[in-house]
Amino acid sequence: MHNQSPIIRRKSTRIYVGNVPIGDGAPIAVQSMTNTRTTDVEATVNQIKALERVGVDIVRVSVPTMDAAEAFKLIKQQVNVPLVADIHFDYRIALQVAEYGVDCLRINPGNIGNESRIRSVVDCARDKNIPIRIGVNGGSLEKDIQEKYGEPTPEALLESAMRHVDILDRLNFDQFKVSVKASDVFLAVQSYRLLAARIDQPLHLGITEAGGARSGSVKSAIGLGLLLSEGIGDTLRISLAADPVEEVKVGFDILKSLRIRARGINFIACPTCSRQEFDVIGTVNALEQRLEDIITPMDISIIGCVVNGPGEALVSTLGVTGGHKKSGFYEDGVRQKERFDNEQMIDQLEAKIRAKASMMDESNRIAVNLLEK
């Protein structure tokens, strides 16, 4: 039941991606990106809906062609989450998706043509209240910057970002956020630190091309964890060579671990040893799968013996401490008379968690109604 995060977040300006507030103290938004062919409307819509079910706040969709732009129009009509169109080189695509209700444009102003083309996109974004994300990547720096620095460095990524920021500044456009992603953790972290000291706009965090589900999650947790612990970051994406749904789950787990944004259950479980009185690993794995639909913030401790179990249970919403044949049960840190049969642990604990979540949700609804009165 540790609710308050000690992290003091960096002050940033406020923008909106659709109805999602970004920056200026708003909850850190979790983003993902589709990996389907955008022209395959059905597959893309299905993937976005799967992302919606696990709580994604914003979804980015690559729009490389005019055919993809036409598909984007149909996709936008069938989903509820705000969509970001990822566009490079052809400014006309940006203008087209703006007509189709895009919620944010991910462009680099410097690579979509001459100043008149940049101005036309920015003017369109301003007229339609569409924010822009400047997305700098260590693997695609401008040729002159590559030649100047020889390799991607934090200073190189900063210079690239500021080049695009300056373009928007000259056009008096301030509704934008910026990212400076790299696949190397140290490079990305230092680049974001430099950028955070230079601008007030919201920052979108990510370790790009982080790797597969396991290695990429570890890299992202380290890199983003460092930045978030320093108060840097307003949106994030976990870039994995895996199902995008996993990106969202890992993103929320990172925020949950830092007590920045709670969504769903935070399981506290021991790694097990010969003292365990029930199958801790099997119990945790089963409950994680069964309870994915629970979004109520809760700390659930599942400890196999009495060495650490009671202590963890004291600071948990619900807790189980392993005992011989039957295990002790705690609610809000208080030991209950009821004990769980170790063989029926999973079903019994699932029922208790669901009941507690419903009760907490109802209490929150009552509190909100009282405040509104």
From Swiss-Prot:
One of its GO terms (molecular function) is iron ion binding. InterPro entries: Dihydropteroate_synth-like_sf (IPR011005), Enolase-like_C_sf (IPR036849), IspG_bac (IPR016425), IspG_bac-typ (IPR004588), NO2/SO3_Rdtase_4Fe4S_sf (IPR045854). Its EC number is 1.17.7.3. It catalyses: (2E)-4-hydroxy-3-methylbut-2-enyl diphosphate + oxidized [flavodoxin] + H2O + 2 H(+) = 2-C-methyl-D-erythritol 2,4-cyclic diphosphate + reduced [flavodoxin]. It is an enzyme of class 1 (oxidoreductase). The keyword Metal-binding applies. Keywords: 4Fe-4S, Iron, Iron-sulfur, Isoprene biosynthesis, Metal-binding, Oxidoreductase. One of its GO terms (biological process) is terpenoid biosynthetic process. Its cofactor is [4Fe-4S] cluster. Binds 1 [4Fe-4S] cluster. Pathway: Isoprenoid biosynthesis; isopentenyl diphosphate biosynthesis via DXP pathway; isopentenyl diphosphate from 1-deoxy-D-xylulose 5-phosphate: step 5/6. Converts 2C-methyl-D-erythritol 2,4-cyclodiphosphate (ME-2,4cPP) into 1-hydroxy-2-methyl-2-(E)-butenyl 4-diphosphate. Belongs to the IspG family. This is 4-hydroxy-3-methylbut-2-en-1-yl diphosphate synthase (flavodoxin). The gene is ispG.
